[in-house]
């Protein structure tokens, strides 16, 4: 096991215009303050205020948006980070681990990773992801790329269909088709930060949001040693070279994770479990009394000093006996949140310290709050009650189905841009309006300038006489469409769909 030295992980250099020379503690902290400014002032963060956490198109300001959720995650992440550093200080480990002058950057990286953790999520959350992936699967059929004979290939895109005698190109076709059918919010977050927003963050800060280490084009089984770290796609083919450089700069082995990402993940797990239940009460899906009984029933028999008793029962009893001039709902969730944090944050911090050799190496193949402990059981309790009584509620399911239809419908509306030949689309990009393509011209005008420029830059770097050029061009054209639609807010996607389907009143 390599020696633990966080100076080798908290890399304050950047991809472009990186600070040079040896820096003092204060100068390094200023570099990460610059990261904070770039992140907080970015449009991607502002858009989170119109993407909802559980209830799409929610107009009740008391119900969480992705932004308010991310701010809560940021605070919990800060709490865990401070707890870790405090315990390390007591154990006289800060200097031994190279953290004595990096406590500020340590906290800042965790906080900003928490704030950014949802920036790549499309409208309507997981149903938006599913809509994008299903739409592309129905056209690219990545599973057919593994089949024989080649005549069985149902891919509707001629350039990406497998061909006899073109095995090197066929392998690229397989990768592209697999990649495009595995849109994922975390991978899109990496793409946003580096390619679309060009935020030029420090290597360490980007490492903090690389939650999953599996490439989106991965085919086959994942290694047992990394099955948790690779359970979802973490980055796309378009960012392959950037991630390779990131691994080098952060001393990460293949498919390994940056150490501080475990803290961000734990903060998210703690935050959303309680928040989803509180939002459900706000939405009148159930009362706080009904929620308590759901929790009690799901936990089952327990002793007086059990974690359930100390956290949930304690919150319930205090909320009913407290004389504060606050509603029972407000008091219950205040105590539930405080009790949960006071138990789970120290536990997560200690798990981080206890497993630091594997975490520092990036190979710890679990979440911090995923084990056989009561703390893990408490999180599972919150999640299971939410799945059973919130996510399966008819109102929630109807909104999710509507969201799926909106995203699928928008992709179908913009499909003519993907149907153009390479030469025709190139002409449209250069001229922006082509008389013989009136529909395609108008659709192209609706795409954001940022996304169009990202496409142009990516394609312009490719040698046009390359045999792979048509494949890569089509790949980046698909990315252009995914970038545009996934970057919409819930309400914008809903309104755009209604306008283009001519149902706007």
UniProtKB/Swiss-Prot annotation:
Keyword annotations from UniProtKB, A to Z: Hydrolase, Magnesium
Superkingdom of the organism of origin: Bacteria
GO biological process: dGTP catabolic process
Reaction(s) catalysed by this chain's protein: dGTP + H2O = 2'-deoxyguanosine + triphosphate + H(+)
EC number: 3.1.5.1
SMART domains: HDc
Boundaries of every HD domain copy: 66-273
Keyword presence, Amino-acid biosynthesis: no
GO molecular function: dGTPase activity; magnesium ion binding
Cofactor annotation: Mg(2+)
Family membership: Belongs to the dGTPase family. Type 1 subfamily.
Annotated NCBIfam families: dGTP_triPase, PRK04926.1
Function noted in UniProt: dGTPase preferentially hydrolyzes dGTP over the other canonical NTPs.
Quaternary assembly: Homotetramer.
Listed PANTHER family: DEOXYGUANOSINETRIPHOSPHATE TRIPHOSPHOHYDROLASE, DEOXYNUCLEOSIDE TRIPHOSPHATE TRIPHOSPHOHYDROLASE
Stated name of the protein: Deoxyguanosinetriphosphate triphosphohydrolase
Provenance organism: Shigella boydii serotype 18 (strain CDC 3083-94 / BS512)
